[in-house]
Amino acid sequence: MPQDTNTALFKVIPQQLPEAEDGLEAIFELVAAGLYSLASMLLGEGEESVRLVEEAVANAEVSVCQDPQVARESSRRDLCAAALKVLAQRDPESLAAPAGLAPASVCIEEDDLASAGISSEELEGMIAGPERDRVREWLESLPTWIRVVFVLRAVAGFSAAETAALLRTHGGPDAAAWTPDAAREVFRQGLCSLASQLLQASAAR
């Protein structure tokens, strides 16, 4: 099994953080903007995603720690945990660990974005740029459990072990059997689907 890789599609807060004199308001805005994009990929756009972002930012206690990195990590994890709970409430079986999952013969051998023929910067540009709607339509076409694993790994930047732990802890009883190996294999399936989409888009040009 390939070693785990932490392939964040984009950072929840952009690398260029505001100077201290810019105040905490700018930090809140940066945190919230990245978190909403993440929430909408997990839950869809709308009031529910907005609510989870507000709660995650509040729980990050930015005003206390005044550390953007700590705020980013805390709010990102809080939001993903809350989103998993919402998904489990919507459909308890949607986050169930796939039974009897074994390494399949798919087009991607490694569990990283490079194996799909795209860099994290390129995919970040697709999500934020003109290809945004097409990328989101592709994500929405995936089964919930594949979409969630893909977003947690590629977008939020969690490792396979962290992804499995989040699903077990917050995905409801049906998600109790998730393992790091299962998260790796499902992520590979998502990467294979992404590679197929990229090939189709390239052929259509």
Where are these regions (language model features)?
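Arg/Lys-rich amphipathic alpha helix in sigma70-family domain 2
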Residues: 68-70, 79-114
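Short, aromatic/basic-enriched loop-to-helix "N-cap" motif that marks the start
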Residues: 47-51, 63-82, 176-180
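Short, small-hydrophobic-rich alpha-helical interface motif
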Residues: 31, 35, 39, 52-61, ...
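Sigma70-family region 2
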Residues: 16-18, 53-74, 91-94
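Short amphipathic alpha-helical boundary/capping segments
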Residues: 12-14, 122-127, 133-142, 194-201
